[in-house]
């Protein structure tokens, strides 16, 4: 009987070993995923703290709330993009999900921030590209009319609204690049030689640096 039952026990042992091995792999993967999640949460928390630090919030409780709103927004966007990249969410559904986050995020910020501070948050999420670019256009083209300046600002503002929810620095800058192309076409159509003006602007910048 002992010899007859031996193969059975051997099979059971193999099964248990297989379970242990697979469990070990699963736990390892889980630990790695948990570590990556913790690292990401720390990163977005630091980003949020940096943005909030420039808002001039005097109420510490409000500052913490705003910090958490920004950090959670980063995390929610990351979850959507991760699901899209893993095939669990179609690109179209991912875009819709991202769009649905936008207004509620701004509404949450409005509970503790004024309009100017919300603009600062938007600039913080997009590396300050809007004010930098708008200033650059005015410096390069001092002859711009009020109407042209307003149109440039409108398009850069649209770019920022899109860029603030983008998944990476590259994608954020990509939105501004797209709208800058639109702006340059608009100015070229108005008779401005953008290549010539750009070269002249660079010369002025170099001349300033020498002073």
Residue ranges, per PLM feature:
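Charge-rich (acidic/polar
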Residues: 32-211
């Amino acid at each position: 009987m002992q010899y007859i039952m031996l193969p059975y026990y051997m099979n059971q042992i193999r099964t248990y070993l297989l379970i242990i091995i697979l469990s070990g792999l699963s736990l390892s993967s889980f630990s790695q995923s948990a570590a990556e999640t913790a690292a990401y949460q720390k990163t977005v928390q630091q980003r949020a703290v940096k943005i909030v630090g420039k808002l001039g919030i005097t109420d510490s409780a409000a500052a913490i709330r705003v910090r958490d709103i920004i950090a959670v927004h980063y995390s929610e966007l990351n979850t959507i993009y991760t699901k899209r990249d893993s095939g669990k969410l179609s690109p179209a559904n991912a875009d819709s999900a991202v769009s649905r986050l936008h207004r509620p995020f701004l509404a949450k910020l409005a509970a503790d921030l004024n309009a100017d501070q919300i603009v600062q948050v938007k600039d913080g999420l997009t590396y300050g590209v809007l004010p930098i670019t708008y200033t650059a256009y005015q410096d390069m083209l001092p002859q711009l009319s009020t109407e042209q300046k307003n149109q440039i600002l409108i398009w850069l503002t649209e770019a920022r609204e899109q860029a603030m929810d983008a998944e990476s620095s590259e994608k954020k800058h990509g939105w501004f690049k797209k709208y800058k192309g639109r702006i340059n076409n608009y100015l070229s159509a108005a008779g401005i030689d953008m290549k010539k003006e750009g070269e002249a602007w660079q010369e002025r910048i170099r001349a300033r640096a020498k002073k």
